[in-house]
A protein has these predicted regions:
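N-terminal secretory signal peptides that target proteins for export/translocation
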Residues: 1-6
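Hydrophobic alpha-helical segments and their boundary regions
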Residues: 8-11, 99
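Bacterial N-terminal signal peptides
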Residues: 10-21
Length: 176
């Protein structure tokens, strides 16, 4: 049986902080870059007075089938929200609405993780596997996300994991 974590306010907060979903209104909403570590960066912010820290990366490559389908930028982030007792939540914003009632997959080497999808976001379906996924990400070279859009377009995004461990360590230290 899978344990599904239904996303809270983290995705809209992070998107707003990055300027992807409208302007952030308060100064605390603006993320502070804690450090850039190769392909990953660490950030912190305090929207609504609640501290949020996260490691963030863009894909190194993106493909669609059929080829050339337009979409918004994709991002992967791992967030820690102490006020919500959330630590190392893996999230993906894929840049298009996923096909309803479908899962995405995240692959690190030969290890696959099912991802629950909602609108343009994906989260690990079985929360009990999240620590194992983080450990695989820390040890891996890249992570591939595969999903299907509401229009049936298949996508494959490859994220480099170079710098992830350092960015994650920095974000975790900031949000102790």
């Amino acid at each position: 049986m899978s344990a599904i974590r239904f996303p809270g306010a983290a995705v809209p907060v992070v998107l707003a902080m990055l300027g992807l979903a409208g302007a952030a209104t308060a100064q605390g909403d603006q993320p502070t870059l804690l450090g850039q570590y190769s392909d990953w960066a660490a950030y912190a912010a305090s929207p609504g007075g609640k501290k949020v820290c996260f490691a963030l990366a863009k894909p190194k490559s993106s493909q669609t089938n059929p080829p050339g389908r337009p979409r918004d930028p994709a991002y992967m982030f791992i967030s820690t929200r102490p006020a919500e007792n959330v630590r190392n939540e893996v999230s993906i914003i894929i840049g298009y609405p996923f096909k309803p009632s479908t899962d995405a997959t995240a692959e690190i080497g030969a290890t696959k993780f099912a991802m629950y999808t909602q609108n343009d976001g994906a989260w690990i379906k079985n929360v009990a596997e999240e620590a194992r996924m983080i450990e695989a990400m820390r040890k891996g070279a890249d992570l591939t996300v595969k999903g299907v859009s509401g229009r049936g377009t298949q996508s494959t995004d490859q994220f480099s994991l170079k710098g992830l461990a350092q960015a994650l360590d920095r974000a975790e230290a900031e949000c102790k």
